[in-house]
Amino acid sequence: IHVDNTLYCSIRDGHQIVKISLDSSDSTWSNVAGMGCAGSTEDMLDQPFGIYVNDNYNLYVADTGNDRIQLFHHEESKGITVAGRALGARFALDKPTNIMLDADNNLFIVDSGNQRIVRVGANGFRCLIGCSKSWCSKLDEVCQPLTAAFDSYGNIFITNQYMNGIQ
């Protein structure tokens, strides 16, 4: 739910992002991103999962099936890839499932297929957690991470599908 009381939803198998105002009596959902069928062009999505809407109504989408993060500027139907294979091997993602943006506009990505959490910002692309590429062998590794969230102190909490828990 955005600060203006608009609910944004990712329709994974519908390959789109929709929104509805919770203050309106109109119960019509509006399409925000995606065309309703899977695709990889700038106006299409493939199994979108996590979403984030910033204060300027720009929408960030974890486009899981396309292994990328798409940015849709407010009222724009075509997205811009801000992380993913299209930007080169250094920025490659594998099934990203969640995204968060901090006050400094750093983008934090749950890169589920690569078992890691990465940050993309002014200082570039950096792996933060799960960087050793080992799979579930140590306490500081993540196993099939799905979502993540920060608390008010800046600590990160990660849901872990493999171990059915939170790290």
Write out the residue ranges for each language-model feature.
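Short loop/turn segments immediately following the C-termini of beta-strands
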Residues: 12, 22, 56, 64, ...
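Structural signal for beta-propeller blades
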Residues: 15-18, 67-70, 115-117, 164-167
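Loop/turn-rich, solvent-exposed surfaces of beta-rich toroidal or solenoidal domains
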Residues: 90-122
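Blade-level signature of beta-propeller repeat domains, shared across WD40, Kelch, NHL, RCC1
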Residues: 143-167
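Residue-level detector of Asp-centered blade-edge/turn motifs that repeat once per structural unit
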Residues: 1-4, 53-56, 101-104, 150-153
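Conserved beta-propeller blade signature
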Residues: 6-9, 58-61, 106-108, 155-158
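Gly/Pro-rich loop segments of beta-rich domains
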Residues: 24-49, 76-97, 122-146
